[in-house]
Amino acid sequence: MKNIHCINHPLIEHKLGILRAKETKPFQFRMLIDEISSFLLFEASKDFSLKEIEISTPIQKTTVKKLDEKIMICPILRAALGMLESVFKMIPDASVGFLGFVRNEETLKADFYFQKLPKDAKKRTAIVIDPMFATGGTAIEACNFLKSQGVKKIKFISILAAPQGLKKFSQMHDDVEVFVACIDEGLNEKGYIIPGLGDAGDRVFNTL
């Protein structure tokens, strides 16, 4: 699966260990989600195009480089809201396109209930964020929708992923690069990532 990138880094592994622990408090959990998301964004943005512009330093004029892509961050509600601020800090000029999915606990499929994209979405590079990449259903439907709206370039960032979901996704969207901090063992009978970290949304918003 050439489109799947698992980012190996000692600091990511250290932070993941704390993130997984059930004793980790909500404010710590949010901070760790934010920090790990920043690492993943660095990797996902390596091929972003740049343009040269002329500026004046306090000493003289010089040529510098500036991002030459219009970015749209697409958080999948609600858990991905915990990742949004870290991406905004790195790309403050980005627009946000919200995608709402709710998991059907009987079928384990993702039901699409809300979307709000910028008017120029088709001209933007989409960075879809969702902390958990489990069955792949939500990721597939999110990319299906974005492509139906004319979005040409999509990247996906997740904290944890299950191999089953990544394989299924790659079969449907091999043109979408996925960046994850860790690929876990798999899924349990309820479709949750194991060993995982629990319900990311509940832990971010302290609704356990």
Curated annotation (Swiss-Prot):
Its EC number is 2.4.2.9. The keyword Transferase applies. It catalyses: UMP + diphosphate = 5-phospho-alpha-D-ribose 1-diphosphate + uracil. Binds 1 Mg(2+) ion per subunit. The magnesium is bound as Mg-PRPP. GO terms for molecular function: GTP binding; magnesium ion binding; uracil phosphoribosyltransferase activity. It comes from the Bacteria. Pfam families: UPRTase. Uracil binds at residues 193, 198-200. Belongs to the UPRTase family. This is Uracil phosphoribosyltransferase. The gene is upp.
